[in-house]
């Protein structure tokens, strides 16, 4: 009943869907009353729709049971929506462990900044000149704590933090990816009328993309 499998008790494993089989596997683990659940890529073989449904079911069940769960996944949507804390690893080395919100808003390093988020954060390596850096025709004044410590910095801008307007960063759009409510513009930054070798992604309202 806890797993909503009453209607399938007379079925054989081959007659169950992928999501139902996952719930059966969870049931086998639950009856052992473990102190910790370890789930290793439990949704990797499911299609996108079923993955979303099963993800919500697992999250609801985990909250109901209150059992600590270590969830291993390469899917950041699963990690960000299901985890209280997310540990980001690269080549087996821990990069940052924090809440999903903290990872997104305050990434601990460049790897985490570029990894968390889809599309990924725009990252620009820019040279410092007179306490500022230039991104296209946009001048960014740097904090005093940064000036003098390095010759260049990496500036990160999320796609959703860019807005269409008449002033700011000029870009040539190579492709528009329409996803319904949102659309993503993929292109390159233009400075002084010349295209630069810096790609950029911007999120815009899907109801009227350029």
Sequence positions of predicted segments:
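ABC ATPase nucleotide-binding domains
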Residues: 1-111
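Short glycine-rich loop/turn motifs that provide flexible caps or phosphate-binding loops at active sites
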Residues: 17-18, 26, 91, 116, ...
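Short, flexible micro-motifs
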Residues: 21-22, 30-32, 95, 120, ...
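Glycine-rich, flexible loop/turn motifs
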Residues: 99, 111-112, 175, 200
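Non-catalytic connector elements of ABC transporters
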Residues: 119-123, 131-210
């Amino acid at each position: 009943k806890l797993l909503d499998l009453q209607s399938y008790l007379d079925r054989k494993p081959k007659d169950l869907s992928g999501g139902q089989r996952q719930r059966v596997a969870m049931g086998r683990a639950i009856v052992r009353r473990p102190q910790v659940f370890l789930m290793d890529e439990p949704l990797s073989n499911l299609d996108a729709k079923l993955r979303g449904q099963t993800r919500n079911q697992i999250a609801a069940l985990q909250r109901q049971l209150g059992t600590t769960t270590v969830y291993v996944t390469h899917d950041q949507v699963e990690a960000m929506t299901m985890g209280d804390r997310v540990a980001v690893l690269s080549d087996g080395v821990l990069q940052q462990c924090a809440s999903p919100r903290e990872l997104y808003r305050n990434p601990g390093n460049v790897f985490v900044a570029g990894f968390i988020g889809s599309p990924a954060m725009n990252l620009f390596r820019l040279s410092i000149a007179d306490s500022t850096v230039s991104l296209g025709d946009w001048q960014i004044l740097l904090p005093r704590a940064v000036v003098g410590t390095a010759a260049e910095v990496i500036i990160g801008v999320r796609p959703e933090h860019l807005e269409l307007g008449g002033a700011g960063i000029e870009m040539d759009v190579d492709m528009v990816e329409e996803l319904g409510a949102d659309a993503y513009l993929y292109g390159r930054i233009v400075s002084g009328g010349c295209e630069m070798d810096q790609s950029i992604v911007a999120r815009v309202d899907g109801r009227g993309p350029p």
